[in-house]
Amino acid sequence: IYEPGLQELVTKNYKANRLSFAKSLKDAIIKSDIVFICVGTPTKKNNYSADLSQIYKVIQEIIKNIKKFKVIVMKSTVPVTTGDEIEKIILQKKSKKLFSVISNPEFLREGEALRDFMFPDRIVIGTNNTKANNTMKNLYDPIIKKGTKYLNTSRRGAELIKYASNAFLATKISYINEIANLCEKTNVNIEDVSIGIGLDQRIGSRFLRPGPAYGGSCFPKDTKALLSTAKKFNTNLSIIKSTVKSNDRRHKFLSNKIKKLLKNKIKNKRITFLGVTFKPNTDDIRESSSLKLIPLLHK
């Protein structure tokens, strides 16, 4: 995936011997004090739950190569209680004195990842292990000294913070899109409404730009995974359900709007899509609104 500035930064630090690459996973684990797990957790094809198969595959490799104390950091977005399950698996083979499983969710935006890493809104560490917490504090010390807030919470708390954050942002997008629909019907300028809402400091202006449905590698899968978790724990997240349904309807709504503008004479028309990625400054087309809209126009 393309990320502005990343290639140059990797090259610079590799040449300065601040960055190295291991030839095998075994070597990387043995030589490290902290092991970050940063693999994909896509939505399963048959339901809304997160596919954790890549997580468990990596865990088996880590278990084989734990020789001294390791802080095992879950960066991947995983459902609440995943850390508990991982700890149980490792404890079957290794002593608790040799490891600590913690949650450290990432909040990077594609296209803005370098800035978000260097100047994050917050650093969230989920652990009740003092040694592991101190290790992570030392790691992030240069960033903390810049004034970044550091939150030490429970492992489950950190896991849920990530999902709840993404679901809230997705809800803001679906909300402003529905308000935009009402603005069209009432002949009101949605841009003015958006600005007026955003000037309220309790709300803020970000994620209040009306447009296509949300997409990408996070919001679609994370809202669905959160609903799956809620179902597992017999909890009704009606707002998140509505967010997902509203977002799914958005594609059909835009398709119908385009057809209406063309007076339903869409056959043999040439329609240009300016960008098929889900957002600017990335080449990621996962859950892209454009790629969902194009087939609807062909129907």
Predicted feature locations:
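Structural/interface elements that position substrates and couple domains in central-metabolism enzymes
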Residues: I1-K299
